[in-house]
Amino acid sequence: MNTGTAVITGASSGLGLQCARALLRRDASWHVVLAVRDPARGRAAMEELGEPNRCSVLEVDLASVRSVRSFVETVRTTPLPPIRALVCNAGLQVVSGIAFTDDGVEMTFGVNHLGHFALVTGILDWLARPARIVVVSSGTHDPSKHTGMPDPRCRYTTSKLCNVLFTYELDRRLDHGEQGVMVNAFDPGLMPGSGLARDYPPILRLAYRLLSPMLRVLPFVHSTRVSGEHLAALAVDPRFAGVTGQYFAGAKAIRSSAESYDRAKALDLWETSERLLAQVT
Protein backbone atom coordinates (compact mmCIF):
# COMPACT_ATOMS: atom_id res chain seq x y z
CA MET A 1 0.00 0.00 0.00
CA ASN A 2 1.26 3.50 -0.87
CA THR A 3 1.41 5.70 2.23
CA GLY A 4 2.88 8.84 0.72
CA THR A 5 3.07 10.72 -2.58
CA ALA A 6 6.06 12.59 -3.98
CA VAL A 7 5.43 15.15 -6.73
CA ILE A 8 8.44 15.70 -9.02
CA THR A 9 8.45 18.39 -11.71
CA GLY A 10 10.42 17.76 -14.88
CA ALA A 11 10.31 14.02 -14.22
CA SER A 12 10.20 12.77 -17.81
CA SER A 13 13.99 12.80 -18.25
CA GLY A 14 17.33 13.69 -16.70
CA LEU A 15 17.60 14.42 -12.99
CA GLY A 16 13.84 14.29 -12.39
CA LEU A 17 13.49 10.84 -13.94
CA GLN A 18 16.48 9.52 -11.99
CA CYS A 19 15.06 10.99 -8.78
CA ALA A 20 11.78 9.17 -9.43
CA ARG A 21 13.64 5.94 -10.15
CA ALA A 22 15.69 6.19 -6.95
CA LEU A 23 12.64 7.05 -4.86
CA LEU A 24 10.60 4.12 -6.19
CA ARG A 25 13.51 1.77 -5.61
CA ARG A 26 14.31 2.95 -2.08
CA ASP A 27 10.83 2.63 -0.53
CA ALA A 28 7.84 0.63 -1.77
CA SER A 29 5.43 2.78 0.25
CA TRP A 30 5.81 5.82 -2.03
CA HIS A 31 3.67 6.85 -4.98
CA VAL A 32 5.27 9.26 -7.48
CA VAL A 33 3.51 11.93 -9.53
CA LEU A 34 5.50 12.72 -12.67
CA ALA A 35 4.61 16.38 -13.22
CA VAL A 36 5.54 17.00 -16.85
CA ARG A 37 4.93 19.45 -19.67
CA ASP A 38 4.52 16.70 -22.27
CA PRO A 39 2.19 13.89 -21.08
CA ALA A 40 3.35 11.55 -23.86
CA ARG A 41 6.94 11.80 -22.65
CA GLY A 42 5.68 11.39 -19.11
CA ARG A 43 3.91 8.16 -20.00
CA ALA A 44 7.06 6.91 -21.74
CA ALA A 45 9.03 7.70 -18.57
CA MET A 46 6.47 5.84 -16.45
CA GLU A 47 6.79 2.83 -18.73
CA GLU A 48 10.59 3.01 -18.43
CA LEU A 49 10.32 3.10 -14.63
CA GLY A 50 8.31 -0.12 -14.72
CA GLU A 51 6.05 0.78 -11.79
CA PRO A 52 2.72 1.75 -13.38
CA ASN A 53 0.75 1.11 -10.20
CA ARG A 54 2.99 3.44 -8.20
CA CYS A 55 3.18 6.33 -10.67
CA SER A 56 0.82 8.94 -12.06
CA VAL A 57 1.46 11.33 -14.94
CA LEU A 58 -0.04 14.82 -14.62
CA GLU A 59 0.46 17.69 -17.02
CA VAL A 60 1.85 21.05 -15.92
CA ASP A 61 3.50 23.82 -17.92
CA LEU A 62 5.55 25.97 -15.57
CA ALA A 63 5.62 28.70 -18.22
CA SER A 64 1.91 29.26 -17.59
CA VAL A 65 0.50 30.30 -14.22
CA ARG A 66 -2.93 29.12 -15.36
CA SER A 67 -1.48 25.68 -16.12
CA VAL A 68 0.10 25.54 -12.67
CA ARG A 69 -3.19 26.48 -11.03
CA SER A 70 -4.98 23.82 -13.06
CA PHE A 71 -2.36 21.27 -12.01
CA VAL A 72 -2.83 22.15 -8.33
CA GLU A 73 -6.59 21.69 -8.68
CA THR A 74 -6.06 18.34 -10.42
CA VAL A 75 -3.76 17.16 -7.63
CA ARG A 76 -6.31 18.20 -5.03
CA THR A 77 -9.11 16.26 -6.72
CA THR A 78 -7.14 13.15 -7.74
CA PRO A 79 -7.29 10.23 -5.30
CA LEU A 80 -3.66 9.96 -4.21
CA PRO A 81 -1.90 8.91 -1.02
CA PRO A 82 -1.08 11.94 1.18
CA ILE A 83 1.42 14.28 -0.50
CA ARG A 84 4.52 14.35 1.68
CA ALA A 85 7.23 15.45 -0.76
CA LEU A 86 7.45 18.09 -3.49
CA VAL A 87 10.57 18.22 -5.65
CA CYS A 88 10.87 21.42 -7.70
CA ASN A 89 13.27 20.12 -10.31
CA ALA A 90 12.17 21.32 -13.76
CA GLY A 91 14.33 24.00 -15.33
CA LEU A 92 15.62 25.42 -18.58
CA GLN A 93 18.22 27.71 -20.11
CA VAL A 94 17.54 30.17 -22.91
CA VAL A 95 20.93 30.46 -24.55
CA SER A 96 20.28 33.00 -27.28
CA GLY A 97 18.01 36.00 -27.43
CA ILE A 98 15.13 36.35 -25.02
CA ALA A 99 11.87 34.44 -24.68
CA PHE A 100 8.74 35.01 -22.61
CA THR A 101 6.20 32.83 -20.84
CA ASP A 102 2.49 32.81 -21.65
CA ASP A 103 2.14 35.47 -18.95
CA GLY A 104 4.75 37.83 -20.42
CA VAL A 105 7.50 37.01 -17.93
CA GLU A 106 11.09 36.35 -19.05
CA MET A 107 11.15 32.60 -19.70
CA THR A 108 14.10 31.52 -17.53
CA PHE A 109 12.83 33.35 -14.46
CA GLY A 110 9.26 32.34 -15.27
CA VAL A 111 9.90 28.60 -15.43
CA ASN A 112 12.79 28.16 -13.00
CA HIS A 113 11.37 30.39 -10.25
CA LEU A 114 7.89 31.84 -10.77
CA GLY A 115 6.23 28.63 -11.96
CA HIS A 116 7.57 26.75 -8.96
CA PHE A 117 6.62 29.64 -6.65
CA ALA A 118 3.04 29.34 -7.92
CA LEU A 119 3.14 25.57 -7.48
CA VAL A 120 4.51 25.61 -3.94
CA THR A 121 2.26 28.36 -2.64
CA GLY A 122 -0.75 26.77 -4.34
CA ILE A 123 -0.22 23.27 -2.99
CA LEU A 124 1.29 24.10 0.41
CA ASP A 125 -1.94 23.75 2.40
CA TRP A 126 -2.58 20.41 0.71
CA LEU A 127 0.67 18.82 1.91
CA ALA A 128 0.34 16.20 4.63
CA ARG A 129 2.51 16.80 7.68
CA PRO A 130 5.34 16.11 8.05
CA ALA A 131 6.28 17.06 4.50
CA ARG A 132 9.38 18.09 2.59
CA ILE A 133 9.98 20.51 -0.25
CA VAL A 134 13.25 20.38 -2.20
CA VAL A 135 14.10 23.17 -4.64
CA VAL A 136 16.77 22.28 -7.21
CA SER A 137 19.22 25.14 -7.61
CA SER A 138 22.79 25.18 -8.91
CA GLY A 139 26.30 26.06 -7.81
CA THR A 140 26.20 28.70 -10.54
CA HIS A 141 23.81 30.76 -8.39
CA ASP A 142 26.67 32.65 -6.73
CA PRO A 143 26.88 36.13 -8.35
CA SER A 144 30.39 36.63 -6.94
CA LYS A 145 31.67 33.98 -9.34
CA HIS A 146 32.37 35.80 -12.59
CA THR A 147 31.70 33.19 -15.24
CA GLY A 148 31.92 35.48 -18.26
CA MET A 149 28.58 34.10 -19.44
CA PRO A 150 26.63 36.24 -21.92
CA ASP A 151 23.30 37.71 -20.81
CA PRO A 152 21.03 34.75 -21.66
CA ARG A 153 23.04 32.36 -19.48
CA CYS A 154 23.34 34.99 -16.74
CA ARG A 155 19.55 34.87 -16.58
CA TYR A 156 19.87 31.18 -15.76
CA THR A 157 22.31 31.78 -12.91
CA THR A 158 20.11 34.58 -11.57
CA SER A 159 17.10 32.25 -11.61
CA LYS A 160 19.12 29.74 -9.59
CA LEU A 161 19.88 32.46 -7.02
CA CYS A 162 16.14 33.09 -6.87
CA ASN A 163 15.67 29.40 -6.06
CA VAL A 164 17.88 29.70 -2.99
CA LEU A 165 16.41 33.02 -1.86
CA PHE A 166 12.94 31.48 -2.19
CA THR A 167 13.96 28.39 -0.22
CA TYR A 168 15.24 30.40 2.72
CA GLU A 169 12.27 32.80 2.75
CA LEU A 170 9.82 29.90 2.59
CA ASP A 171 11.61 28.20 5.47
CA ARG A 172 11.30 31.37 7.55
CA ARG A 173 7.58 31.65 6.75
CA LEU A 174 7.14 28.03 7.80
CA ASP A 175 8.82 28.80 11.13
CA HIS A 176 11.89 26.68 10.38
CA GLY A 177 9.96 23.42 10.36
CA GLU A 178 7.60 24.21 13.23
CA GLN A 179 4.62 23.98 10.84
CA GLY A 180 5.66 20.47 9.82
CA VAL A 181 7.15 21.32 6.42
CA MET A 182 10.90 21.11 5.81
CA VAL A 183 12.34 22.97 2.83
CA ASN A 184 15.86 22.74 1.43
CA ALA A 185 17.76 23.74 -1.71
CA PHE A 186 19.80 21.23 -3.70
CA ASP A 187 22.77 21.63 -6.03
CA PRO A 188 23.12 18.49 -8.18
CA GLY A 189 26.50 19.52 -9.58
CA LEU A 190 27.35 19.51 -13.26
CA MET A 191 25.58 16.59 -14.90
CA PRO A 192 26.63 15.60 -18.42
CA GLY A 193 23.65 14.05 -20.12
CA SER A 194 21.08 15.94 -18.06
CA GLY A 195 19.54 17.58 -21.14
CA LEU A 196 20.16 21.12 -19.90
CA ALA A 197 22.30 21.77 -23.01
CA ARG A 198 19.43 20.84 -25.35
CA ASP A 199 18.84 24.49 -26.31
CA TYR A 200 22.50 25.20 -27.11
CA PRO A 201 23.47 25.98 -30.73
CA PRO A 202 24.46 22.81 -32.66
CA ILE A 203 28.21 23.44 -32.43
CA LEU A 204 28.05 23.90 -28.65
CA ARG A 205 25.89 20.79 -28.24
CA LEU A 206 28.49 18.82 -30.17
CA ALA A 207 31.36 20.23 -28.08
CA TYR A 208 29.47 19.50 -24.85
CA ARG A 209 28.79 15.92 -25.95
CA LEU A 210 32.44 15.34 -26.87
CA LEU A 211 33.76 16.82 -23.63
CA SER A 212 31.28 15.08 -21.33
CA PRO A 213 33.32 11.88 -20.83
CA MET A 214 36.36 13.91 -19.74
CA LEU A 215 34.32 16.06 -17.36
CA ARG A 216 33.25 13.05 -15.31
CA VAL A 217 36.60 12.88 -13.50
CA LEU A 218 36.05 16.28 -11.87
CA PRO A 219 34.79 16.24 -8.24
CA PHE A 220 31.80 18.51 -8.88
CA VAL A 221 30.59 16.46 -11.86
CA HIS A 222 28.03 13.73 -11.22
CA SER A 223 25.89 11.45 -13.33
CA THR A 224 22.16 12.10 -13.29
CA ARG A 225 21.81 8.73 -11.56
CA VAL A 226 24.03 9.72 -8.61
CA SER A 227 22.49 13.18 -8.29
CA GLY A 228 19.03 11.64 -8.59
CA GLU A 229 19.80 9.35 -5.67
CA HIS A 230 20.97 12.30 -3.56
CA LEU A 231 17.85 14.27 -4.47
CA ALA A 232 15.52 11.39 -3.64
CA ALA A 233 17.25 10.90 -0.29
CA LEU A 234 16.80 14.56 0.60
CA ALA A 235 13.11 14.25 -0.27
CA VAL A 236 12.25 11.07 1.65
CA ASP A 237 15.15 9.52 3.59
CA PRO A 238 14.54 9.38 7.37
CA ARG A 239 18.06 10.62 8.09
CA PHE A 240 17.02 14.05 6.78
CA ALA A 241 13.89 14.23 8.93
CA GLY A 242 13.72 17.64 10.59
CA VAL A 243 16.47 19.12 8.41
CA THR A 244 15.31 22.44 6.96
CA GLY A 245 16.57 25.76 5.63
CA GLN A 246 19.77 24.20 4.27
CA TYR A 247 21.63 24.20 0.96
CA PHE A 248 22.89 20.78 -0.11
CA ALA A 249 25.63 20.01 -2.61
CA GLY A 250 24.88 16.38 -3.28
CA ALA A 251 24.45 14.71 0.10
CA LYS A 252 26.29 17.39 2.09
CA ALA A 253 24.89 20.59 3.59
CA ILE A 254 27.15 23.55 2.78
CA ARG A 255 27.00 27.34 2.82
CA SER A 256 25.40 28.90 -0.22
CA SER A 257 26.49 32.24 -1.67
CA ALA A 258 26.68 35.30 0.57
CA GLU A 259 23.98 37.05 -1.46
CA SER A 260 21.56 34.16 -1.01
CA TYR A 261 21.29 35.03 2.71
CA ASP A 262 20.14 38.60 2.00
CA ARG A 263 16.73 38.73 3.68
CA ALA A 264 15.75 42.02 2.05
CA LYS A 265 16.29 40.53 -1.41
CA ALA A 266 14.41 37.38 -0.46
CA LEU A 267 11.45 39.43 0.77
CA ASP A 268 11.51 41.58 -2.37
CA LEU A 269 11.56 38.45 -4.53
CA TRP A 270 8.61 36.98 -2.62
CA GLU A 271 6.51 40.13 -2.87
CA THR A 272 7.39 40.62 -6.54
CA SER A 273 6.41 37.01 -7.24
CA GLU A 274 3.07 37.52 -5.49
CA ARG A 275 2.40 40.63 -7.58
CA LEU A 276 3.22 38.80 -10.81
CA LEU A 277 0.87 35.96 -9.90
CA ALA A 278 -1.90 38.40 -8.98
CA GLN A 279 -1.74 39.86 -12.50
CA VAL A 280 -2.79 36.51 -13.99
CA THR A 281 -6.53 35.92 -13.68
Where in the sequence are the language-model features?
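C-terminal amphipathic/interface module of NAD(P)-dependent oxidoreductases
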Residues: 258-281
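Amphipathic alpha-helical segments in well-structured domains
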Residues: 102-105, 116, 227, 266, ...
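A glycine/serine/threonine-rich, flexible loop-to-helix segment
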Residues: 192-215
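Rossmann-fold NAD(P)H-dependent dehydrogenase/reductase core
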Residues: 1-200, 279-280
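A generic structural signal for short coil/turn motifs at secondary-structure boundaries
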Residues: 95-96, 256-259
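Short glycine/proline- and charge-enriched loop/turn segments
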Residues: 100-103, 149-150, 204-212, 251-252
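C-terminal helical subdomain
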Residues: 159, 209-254, 263-265
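Alpha-helical elements of Rossmann-like donor-binding domains used by nucleotide-donor carbohydrate transfer enzymes
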Residues: 67-70, 74, 230-233, 268, ...
